[in-house]
Every structure is written in C-alpha cells, then in structure tokens.
Amino acid sequence: MSGIQLHDVKKIYPNGFQALHGIDLSIQEGEFMVFVGPSGCAKSTLLRMIAGLESISEGEIVIQNRCVNQVLPKDREVAMVFQNYALYPHMTVYKNMAFSLSGKMPREEIDRRVREAAENLEISHLLERKPGQLSGGQCQRVALGRAIVRRPRVFLFDEPLSNLDAKLRVSMRLQLINLHQQLKAEGLPSTMIYVTHDQVEAMTMGDRICVLDRGVIQQVDKPVTLYHQPANKFVAAFIGSPAMNLHDVTITTNNGQPALSFDDAGKLVLPASVAARLNGYTEAQICLGIRPEHVLITTADAPGALPATVQTVEHMGNEEIVHCDVAGRHFVARFPSSLGWASQPGERIGLQLALDHAHLFDITHGRVLRPASL
C-alpha cells in the first residue's frame, strides 16, 4: 500500500512522559491530511517523527511501502515547511530554492525546476532578492518553493501560516490548496500532512482531518463528518466556531415522553429519533450538544422555549452571535443578520433548541450515543 502508514506509534521520553499513545493511521497517496488539536496534543511531535527529526519509541512508520524507523530524514523523500521559514539570509531567493539540489543534478534541470516553481508561486520577480527584502508571505512562498523543487514524495507542513496576518493567511491557504490540486493533476507526488491548531485552516484545507488530544487520536474523518457527526465530546467542543453548546442534563419524562431536564430552566421533550439513542443507556444524566445555528431565538413566553437573558451580542456583519444565560448555563445562538432580529444585553428572550439536530454524549466517557442501526 502506497502513502503513509503509522502502526501503534508511541513516543516516550527518558523521564517517562508519554507524548503519543499507540497511533494507528493510514494516509493515502495524494491525500491532504491535517493534524489538528490544542497546544500540547503532540501533533507537531507526530509530524517530526514522520520527518525523522524525532525518534520513535515503539511502533512502525511506513512511507511508500518502506519502514523508515531507522532511515535518515534526508533519505525519507519528504520535504518540511516550518513556521519560521528557515531561509538562508545571505542567499538570494533563487539560491535558497536551488540549494538542496546543488550537486545532485545538472544545472539546467535545477534552473528549470526553480523557475517553474517560482512561476507557479508567483515569485519569479523575487528570485534575485534576499529574504530580508521580502514580506512574511513572500518568505513563506519561497520556503514552499524550496520544498517543491525537491519533488518529495510527501510534503510536511508545521503550522506554516501562523506568523502571517489574517488576510495573508487566507491567501496562502488558497495557494496551498491550489498547489495540491495542481500537483495531483500533473501526476506528481502530492501527499501533504499539515499541522495546525487553527480549525478554520483544518476544515477548509484537509481532505481528512485527524483530531488529537493528549497524544491520542480522537477521530479521523472528512471535515463535514467531523462537524455533523463528532465521535465524542472533545471533537464536538473543538470543531466549530462558535463552539457547540454542551450541557449536562438529567434524563426524565414529560407527560410520559422522554425528556431532558435543565433544572430550574425547565424540561424539553426529545424527538423520537433522538430519544431512541438512549436505549440501553443507564446513567441518570447525559451531556447534550447543540450547535449555535440550531438554537433559535423567540419570545420569553413561547411554548417549548428555555427562558434566557441576553448577555452579549456579536455583530459579525453577515450574522449575529448571541450569548445568553439560561439559569446559570451559557448558551450561544447564531443566525443570519438578514433576519433583522435586534436585542440588547439584559433583555429576556426564549431559546428553542432544534433537538432533531442534538448530539448526546455519555456523561462518563464523553462518547457519542448513536442509534442502534449505526
């Protein structure tokens, strides 16, 4: 099998601290895989182990059907792009891009590769400049070009855009996506692994996303699946902005129908399709998850609504994000500005939860509860 396979990969430091716990992951040839997670989740450590910059304690890393545990970084056919660019300040852009090829192929081939990559990255006019004369975005494109000319089997990116301003990050993000598509279209090696803590980057760039927490894979899936079908409470909370509303509630009944109690805020009856997920669940409480776009604002006395008080309203231009207090619980609602709803902090309103879209999580372990058919 081509691509990259990680088999029970562990990282244990001499002091006994275990950073990675039995990582099993298969990355397909030509796939754009994103590693995402909070600071300290070991996503960069895992990337550096694939690159050969960090030793492996246990397990096996396979690249293109070859175990590379004992293979030097320069012989793994990977190219890494770092956050800090790592350019030689005394060399021109041209020489920075050509440096890794010097002495390995004819000058004509080196020149062709450098100029071709520079044209694709729109930096041909910068080839005779030095890094000190470039902007951050230009430096990052040079670093990317330096990786491209090597024609590696795998591109590794370690938070390469985090030093750039917001507008430039968007531009570079699109450029990386286009580069990946272009390499695939030309039949060139295009497997990419991208590390970020920014979930927007993860959701917009990755074919699949690997979510990590404390050195353990929480879920590997397509972006849309992670958003709509999180495997556990951690993924539900981490993916999505604003974050999913998560609240521990008591399982009860209301007129004989399964319901959830929000203590002083009242009860909400569960739709039959959602209530079916509780079959076999024996705990008295459960964690309810609901996305902000599935929290609907209505009047304070509306039937089936939770009484709430507006705390803060974020006017985003195209949408409104409303933070509310519901008997001591924090809820966030999100809706288009075109609806014309306006309110002030302190106003009493009602929140209707679209429970058909609810997620239910085990109160003890945080695992999602799914219907028996799933």
Please provide the spans of the model-predicted regions.
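The feature captures the beta-strand-to-loop junction immediately N-terminal to the Walker
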Residues: 36-38
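ABC ATPase nucleotide-binding domain helices that frame the ATP-binding cleft
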Residues: 44-47, 142
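Helix-to-loop junction immediately C-terminal to a conserved catalytic motif
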Residues: 51
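Conserved post-Walker A/P-loop segment of ABC ATPase nucleotide-binding domains
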Residues: 54-62
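ATP-binding/catalytic-site motifs of ATP-hydrolyzing domains
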Residues: 60, 66-67, 216
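ABC ATPase nucleotide-binding domains
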Residues: 77, 87-234
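Non-catalytic connector elements of ABC transporters
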Residues: 242-244, 254-374
